Amino acid sequence: SNKYADRGELFEGLEIWEDEKYREIQGTYPVIFFSFAKIKQTTYKETIEKIKKIIFDLYQEYAFIGKWDGLTDKEKENFNNISYDMSDVIAQEAIVDLSNYLSRYYGKKVIILLDEYDTPMQEAYVNGFWDELASFTRSLFNSTFKTNPYLERAIMTGITRVSKESVFSDLNNLEVVTTTSNKYMTASGFTEEEGFNSLEKFGYGDKKEEIKKWYDGFVFGKITDIYNPWSILNFLDKGKIDTYWANTSSNGLVSKLVREGDADLKSVFEELLKGKNILCPIDEQIVYNQLDDDSEAVWSLLLASGYLKVVSIEKKVVGKRQLYELSLTNMEVLDMFYDMVRGWFKKSAGNYNAFVKALLINDVEAMNEYMNVISEEIFSNFDVGTKPSKLQPERFYHGFVLGLLVDLAEDYIVTSNRESGF
């Protein structure tokens, strides 16, 4: 960025500074950087308001441009009209307009960096306004990244790879780099050498094996043993092993998909929690509006988000999708999922009756006590009959217990006397 012109000392001693071509361009390009990482609003209106505030703050950062004589009177007026309450159309064109002004002021095309472009989209899916936000975002991205003649290049980072059809349908010349790509394999985390060197430097050399279990496991392309940099840095700062990554990613979306998934999906998820591997096809492009209808898409999302890692790639292909052997990435992810599942039960525990609560913790004595109290205080002879040889009492008790178990229908498979011939 030209904000750091003549600040070469920031890079001295680093490998990148040894390359002359990088030294020559350091501090010469105007850079527009903005992040959607904190856009986690639960309504469309609040989300758009937050995006507009980010755009307004960008303009404030370059407020001096609004007074530049190189702008026409109309352009100065447009510059000063950027506000929190600007129209959607103005907001969608604001970044390309700013690119125009900066390019002319500095005499060079701009570089645009957008961090976590997909965070508001995840919230939109979870909270039910995906279609509205996708439409707005598609127009914003089209003007910013496709029809922008003042753009040198752009980089967008995200937790998931949103499908081209969702918001990138208007964009060309996209180069997509994912966890399975061989490009930039060591750029997204600490290698084992880097991680272990940092442990030695901070006096934690004896913690290497424990740190490996908790924070290793990420796989990028052909490189294994990539460590979570956020967790490593937090450990070095606090000296305590913990789930530092737990609230920094797409947990809300993952929780929704697993919690609302069918019985087969929950069964596979349970296998992962037991430390077992799963075999499934993967499609790295996430089509959000199809997630509810495609139970296998959750595994693609978990892989893209870093919760799962590739153990091996099978030769077999299912449809157009490659078959992968996957496992949970590390102990930190396992601990995070345990907390997530416990949270589900805490939220729903109050909705379970006493009999179901006793059943879930295998407390047979409490189950018997509950049934005895109900039988003595509520049941009538007309309900249970007077002769044990009759079928009617058994049917009554059967129906009563089935009614008690209805609370579990969303989380467990509850069947009753299916016509199976037994």
PLM region spans:
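Substrate-engagement module of ASCE P-loop NTPases
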Residues: 59, 94-106, 132-152
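Amphipathic alpha-helical segments of the small helical/lid subdomains adjacent to P-loop NTPase cores
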Residues: 166-170, 177-235, 268
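Extended alpha-helical interface modules used as scaffolds for assembling large macromolecular complexes
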Residues: 174-175, 226-422
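Short glycine-rich substrate-engagement loop in P-loop NTPases that contacts/grips substrate
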Residues: 80-99
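Short regulatory helix/loop adjacent to the ATP-binding pocket of P-loop NTPases
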Residues: 44, 145-151, 162-180
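Conserved P-loop NTPase "ATPase switch" module shared by AAA+ and STAND
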Residues: 106-130
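Structural recognition of the conserved hydrophobic beta-strand(s) that form the central parallel beta-sheet
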Residues: 33, 111-115, 135, 139, ...
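P-loop NTPase motor core
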Residues: 4-64
